[in-house]
C-alpha cells in the first residue's frame, strides 16, 4: 500500500517555476535553499495557504467574515492536505499585558491552583486568614486547659484616631458595663477623654467565663453577640496568658484586612478584580525621567539644559523659566548640575503655593500679566501627557517619560489581596518571577497536604507538562512574567511550538519558519527532539530551515534553487539527507557533505589598544560586567540563549553610543561608565526591521540609487524639451505619477466576506506613472521599466554610470541581485531588509571610525549566503571600521577576530564574561559551551583543508 503523501502540482507563487513535488505525510520535512530561492513561497504561500483556505472555506459565511479569508495560491492542485497551522516569527503580541505565562496558558492553571488551594495571610500581621463558624470557635476555646479564665471582647475600634465619645455613649446605652481601652479594662462611664490625635483601640467586654464542661451554650450565645457588635471579629483574652483572635469572614481578626472569596479572576492582572489599582495591572507606571528631561547636566539653562523647554517656535515656556529664575535669583548661565538642590527642585517641581507674576506676549506683540504658582517642568509634562487631546503633544511628552516599577505592587501587577494568598509558601507574584526551569523544579517538588494534593493533582499535571515543553525547546531561562513584546522572533516561535505540543493534536500539518533562530547549538538537540515528538503524534511538519543539525535530522529534505529570485524556484534535490548529499547539483548537499565549506581565516586581525571599554554593566541579568570591544576588528558576542548578549550589546553598548554620538533620546541600561567613545563618529544598528512600512518604500528608494536614476531620466533630451525636473519621475508626488492610483499602481477593493482585492490600476496598468512621464526613455526603457528590473539587470543597464553602478553592485555583493528595484519593502524578508541596509552602508565612503552592530545577521541565510555576508563584513573591517555581531552560527563565530563569550547558562545562571579572545582561545576553555562546539568545528575544518 502506497504511503500517504501531499502532492503539489504546478506551484507558481512568486518565483516558483511550475513546481511539482510529492512530500511524505507524518514525516519531518525540511525545506532549504538560498535566501530568496522560493522555500517560503512553496511552504507558506502555497501549501499552508491552501490548507488554511480549505479549512476556512468549510465554515459559514458569517464565521468567515471574522477570520479573513486567504487568497487561493497560484497552484494547479494540491492533494492529501491536512488542516494547516503556521508557526512563524511575525505574530508576536506587543501588548504589555501579554506575558510568557499568559501566552502559554500556564497562568490560567496557576490562577486556578491559587483559587482552589490558596491560603490567604494578613500582610500586616502574617497570620492566616480563615473564615470560621461559631461552632469552630467554640471548639477551639474548649480546647483550652480546664479552669482557664477568659473574657470575650468585641473589637469595635481598631487603632483609629478620635475621641470616640459617641461610640462610648452608645455602648453604655446598650447595657455594657466594661470596655478595654488601649489594653486597659475600665468602666464604660469612667473612660477619660481620649486624645483625638492618637490612635486608640476599644473593645467591649461581653462576657467573662471559666473554661469547663457545660459552658458551650452560653459561650456560643456570647460569641454570636460579639460577632454582631464587631463586624464578625472576636478577641478571646486569656487572663494571665495570650489571646486568641477569630473572624467569621475572610478577614484578619486583628486589623480586619479581608480577602473575598478566592476565585481565578482575583489572580488575573487583566481583570479589575485582580489588577493592582495603581498601575492597572501593568506592573509599571509611565513617569517623567529626569535623565531625559535634563540629558546634559553640564549645560546651563540659557544653553537649553531643560530639553522639553528649549526655545523653539514658541517662547512661552522659556520666558516663564526666565521669570522664575529672576524671582528666585537663579543664575541661568551656571551649569545645571552646579545649581543648589533647592534651585533645581523649584525648576523641576514648581514653586508650590507661592504665586509669581508672569508676563506673556501674544504673537501680535500684545502683553498680558497673570499671577499664579509656577507649575514646574515635571508636573507640566505629566499634565500635558494625561490631559492633552492632541496625539502629537502626548507623543512629544512621552519622549521625556520612562517606565518605572509600580510602588504599590512592586512590579507584580496584582492587588494586595491577591498577593496575600499563598500556596506552599509562595504567592502568585513570586511564582511568576521564577524562570521556566526554576518553576518546573518548584512544581515538580511542591509539598502539599493530602487534601490539597488531591485537589491540585490535575492542575499541577497541566502546569508541569507545559513547563516541561518550554524547557525542552530551550526556553528554560525565560521568566514566566517576561513581557511577550520583549521576546525575539525565535523565542516567540518556540513558545507557540510548545503551546502546540501541549494541545497534543494529531493529523495536523505544521509549517514552521526557522525555529532554531536565536538558539545556541547546545539547545538544538532538544528542539529537534521536540519536532520529532510532534511528528510521532501523527503530524506532518514542514520546516523552512538552514541549520545543519536540523537538516541532517530530517526524514525528508527538499533543496529549492539553484539560485535566488528568478534563478531559483525549482526543486534541485529531494529525498533523505544522504540522498541530497550525493546530488552534485545541490548546493546544500555539497555543504552538508563537506565538499564545500566556509574556511577558517589563515590569519586573524590583531587586537590593538584601540577599544571601547564598558565598566560595571548591570542590564537585566548582567552581573557587574567589565568588557572591552577592540576597534577595527570583527567582534562576535556568543553565549547560550538568555546569557545576556543582547543586554550587553543592544541595551548598553549601542544605546550609550547612540546617545553620545547620534544624540538619540534613548536611555542606556545600567552601567558605571563607558570609555573610548571619542574614537567613534558613527554608530549603525543593522537590524532586521523593515526598510519601510508602506509599499512605496523599496530597495531603490532606501539605498538612494533612485535619486540618481531620476537624475538620469531628467537629463535626457526628451525630459529637457518637456521641461521635466527630477521630481517628475517620483511616484510619491503630484506631477509625474498616475493620479488615479496616487502612484501605487494598484487599487484596493474592499470585499466584506472575502479578503480585500488589489487590482492593477486601469489607468496606468500598474506602471505608477502617467502616460507623459512614461514617454521619456533612457536606452529604450522608461522609469517604470527600470523599477521592474532586477538589481542584476539594472547593474548592467547602468554600467556606464559609475555612481549608479557602484550602489547597485553593493546590492549584488550582499546577494540581492535577484530582487527588483521597485519591490515593495513590505514584501522583503527580515534577512533581505538587513542586507539592503548593509548594502546602503557599503557604498558610503569609509571613515575607519564607524561601528556596525548586527543582531543575528544569519537569520534566513543559507550557508552560501553566509559566506557572501562574511565577505561584505570583512570589507567593512578592512576599511578600518568595527563590527560587533551577536551570533550563534558557528561559521560566523569561527571567522571572528575577537570573541566575547557570555554565560555559563541563561537567565540568572548567566550574565558573566566567561572568556574573550580568538576562537582558538575560546575553544580551549572547557566551561564554555560555545568553546566545546567550536573545538569540534575547528578540528573538522582543519581536516577538510588538509584533505
Would you name each region that the model predicts?
Residues 1-947:
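Conserved phosphate-binding elements of NTP-dependent enzyme cores
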